[in-house]
Amino acid sequence: MATQADLMELDMAMEPDRKAAVSHWQQQSYLDSGIHSGATTTAPSLSGKGNPEDEDVDTNQVLYEWEQGFSQSFTQDQVADIDGQYAMTRAQRVRAAMFPETLDEGMQIPSTQFDSAHPTNVQRLAEPSQMLKHAVVNLINYQDDAELATRAIPELTKLLNDEDQVVVNKAAVMVHQLSKKEASRHAIMRSPQMVSAIVRTMQNTNDVETARCTAGTLHNLSHHREGLLAIFKSGGIPALVKMLGSPVDSVLFYAITTLHNLLLHQEGAKMAVRLAGGLQKMVALLNKTNVKFLAITTDCLQILAYGNQESKLIILASGGPQALVNIMRTYSYEKLLWTTSRVLKVLSVCSSNKPAIVEAGGMQALGLHLTDSSQRLVQNCLWTLRNLSDAATKQEGMEGLLGTLVQLLGSDDINVVTCAAGILSNLTCNNYKNKMMVCQVGGIEALVRTVLRAGDREDITEPAICALRHLTSRHQEAEMAQNAVRLHYGLPVVVKLLHPPSHWPLIKATVGLIRNLALCPANHAPLREQGAIPRLVQLLVRAHQDTQRRTSIGGTQQQFVEGVRMEEIVEGCTGALHILARDIHNRIVIRGLNTIPLFVQLLYSPIENIQRVAAGVLCDVAQDKEAAEAIEAEGATAPLTELLHSRNEGVATYAAAVLFRMSEDKPQDYKKRLSVELTSSLFRTEPMPWNEAADLGLDIGAQGEPLGYRQDDSSYRSFHAAGYGQDAMGMDSMMDHDMGGHHPGADYPVDGLPDLSHAQDLMDGLPPGDSNQLAWFDTDL
């Protein structure tokens, strides 16, 4: 147990620490709670002392530390004197804060402000009065400037018209200085004589400084609508266009920015610039290297070209497409690239400018910016590429662009995906190399995934399906592509697109894709299991009855429904069934749908391609003996015999093959007569026995030469042609048009037909005709 002496010794050892803690808290101006200082139960004091009865604390030391914060001490009399002095000078302090200019010079007023960072209450209250004072001063100065300018303008106008160029120069400098102040600027623009003198001087002077000052004055005036009108009325636009030929950069800058302001805000300025030859001058300036200057110049070109075909042709004649493409290829300044892409977008809907842009390398140059961080630049480039893509199907060196477009199909931006799909659709049409490249970079998987994600957005699904249709025929990787669609789970969604709510353009594209997919034997069973055959027959019956109805009422011209001719649907569906009929199980399904009478009827069609696909499907169906008998029973012999003399070799060959198969169980004498007839019909120039003709027609329709589609037809659908890029729509609304060409709100359902083996009236559900759209063909169906 500790002794009394031990406790006393411990207490004495702790005492200095307690005093140091108290001193520390006093210096920090904290109110000591008594916890850290070692005080026990007594109330804390202002000095931070513990027990007041503790006589061991050094009182002098504590008091000295308490007074350390004061630099000097004051007696009671001194405090009273200072207080009186402050009371006597209160009015002067208020006046000094609010109206310091009214004080006598050298007058000393005691300040109540201890910290310069914290204003006194009087100073804070004086701020509004100071602001008011400055406003009044500015108003007085403004009025002085206006009065000065008003008095000086008549004299300066005379000086600008002086014959002495030195005088004119001095006057131009003075007017330029006046135009920098708002009051005098308004006075100048309200004087038509002055503005006319400025314009005339700028146009006629040979002095660089005079030209710079007058152009600068007009630039300052152009920031006000009143100034723009004054410049316009004074004939300033032709003068400014003339200044675009100046060798001085500052004059060029003033001229182009003033013209830009006029084009943006002054009615009639566009026509005046065109008439003054502004377009030619601006195109010539595109070889400059100042990116900000080029940005303004290209924006002027966009304003002038938008909605004006004549301006587009002038830009073309002046070499604009090449210069604009060079800018896209050379610079990285975002605003310049954006304004230039806007000009190219406007020009890309012009049939004359389009090939010029493509030949200048526009597709490749625009493709360089598809991964830019600027969304507005990317979108403009995509719109332009989409408009150009139908004219670029023969372009070389598109590998980089195609790879980027395939990547963009995975974008979350619907507009980006729509454009990318449309561009790919056009670029893969009839271009062997492009098809190969897209397949090699994973295009099939990306397009199938795009269709799956798009749902019922036909502005995406239609171009994506068209691209798949192109990629699945007539190139080395076509068979791989046909398999890839199945392997990436594309067949169910493709067949689904044959059903409502799909519109005719999408249905036509889907029918063509199914026909190509059927070229791959591995797809026969899956397509059958997905119900493709019954739906194709339904669509065929509906389209055929529509054509029959129009023929019966005396219609001679082919009608369009949502831009699609029903004859194209008849041809497409029959062609797809023809390829599917290569599979025995598919032939059974096709025959079971009572289609043979319809196929025989199609042999009488006046359209040669329908005759060909009808004869083709009958050729494959006739491989089965029962089907051959049914074909003969429907009276097919007469039309088939007539088609033997067709000038179309495919039609004649198929007809011969059907007749040959129908004759297999006929007497030998009949076969001999038929052989003579076939030989004389098919081999007019080089006769050969029919039995040497082997199985003529059995291989026709193979992958390399798709029967039923115009292989020699050079026209095909351009995705921008259904409404894209029309100037009257405004460039930012171009995306409002559907690639499929159907009109929003005009929902034409394609209802399913429950039982095609009965001759029921299918005409009530047909969509009404729409002759406002142009037909389109695609050689890659």
Swiss-Prot record:
A GO BP annotation: cardiac muscle tissue development
**Which species is this record about?**
Xenopus laevis
Residue ranges of the region described as Disordered: 34-56, 735-781
* Gene3D superfamilies noted in UniProt: Leucine-rich Repeat Variant
Sequence ranges of the ARM repeats: 141-180, 225-264, 267-306, 351-390, 391-429, 432-473, 479-519, 521-562, 584-623, 625-664
**Main subcellular location:** cytoplasm
Residue ranges annotated as compositionally biased, kind Basic and acidic residues, are: 735-745
**Similarity comment text for this entry:** Belongs to the beta-catenin family.
Q: Name one GO molecular function term.
A: transcription coactivator activity
What are the alphabetically sorted keywords of the record? Activator, Cell membrane, Cytoplasm, Membrane, Nucleus, Phosphoprotein, Repeat, Transcription, Transcription regulation, Ubl conjugation, Wnt signaling pathway
Q: Which gene encodes it?
A: ctnnb1
Subcellular location as annotated: Cytoplasm; Nucleus; Cell membrane
By what name is this protein known? Catenin beta-1
CDD domains attached to this UniProt entry: CTNNAbd_CTNNB1 (cd21724)
Assembly information from the UniProt record: Interacts with EP-Cadherin/CDH3. Interacts with custos; the interaction is positively regulated by Wnt stimulation.
Maturation and modification:
Phosphorylation by gsk3b promotes ubiquitination and subsequent degradation by the proteasome.
PROSITE patterns for the chain: ARM_REPEAT
Note the InterPro entries from the entry. ARM-like (IPR011989), ARM-type_fold (IPR016024), Armadillo (IPR000225), Beta-catenin (IPR013284)
User: What task does this protein carry out?
Assistant: Key downstream component of the canonical Wnt signaling pathway. In the absence of Wnt, forms a complex with axin1, axin2, apc, csnk1a1 and gsk3b that promotes phosphorylation on N-terminal Ser and Thr residues and ubiquitination of ctnnb1 and its subsequent degradation by the proteasome. In the presence of Wnt ligand, ctnnb1 is not ubiquitinated and accumulates in the nucleus, where it acts as a coactivator for transcription factors of the TCF/LEF family, leading to activate Wnt responsive genes.
Entries under SUPFAM superfamilies matching the protein: ARM repeat
Tissues showing expression:
Expressed at intercalated disks in the heart (at protein level).
Cellular component terms per the entry's GO annotation: adherens junction; basal part of cell; catenin complex; cell-cell junction; cytoplasm; intercalated disc; membrane; nucleoplasm
